[in-house]
Amino acid sequence: MKLTCMMIVAVLFLTAWTFATAEDPRNGLENLFSKAHHEMKNPEDSKLNKRCVKYLDPCDMLRHTCCFGLCVLIACI
């Protein structure tokens, strides 16, 4: 019984958190999914594509952050 109540409270809390942190609370999850769908249709708009480091800029060897080439010491080549 206690576990069931805790699960219900957790689900309600997570649902409220999702709607409270949404950019437009009226659309909630619908807005989130429409953005993801748009990024799938147009991969250039994806945020993941914008995180890479350009040529000769400082990079992170462990995370492979260079757009093209390799990260040697501290710069992308």
Swiss-Prot record:
Alphabetic keyword roster: Disulfide bond, Knottin, Neurotoxin, Secreted, Signal, Toxin
Pfam family name, one: Conotoxin
Tissue distribution: Expressed by the venom duct.
GO cellular component terms listed in the entry, alphabetical order: extracellular region
Localization in the cell: Secreted
Disulfide bonds: C52-C67, C59-C71, C66-C76
Propeptide position ranges: 23-49
Record's signal peptide: 1-22
Protein name: Conotoxin PnMKLT1-0122
Organism of provenance: Conus pennaceus
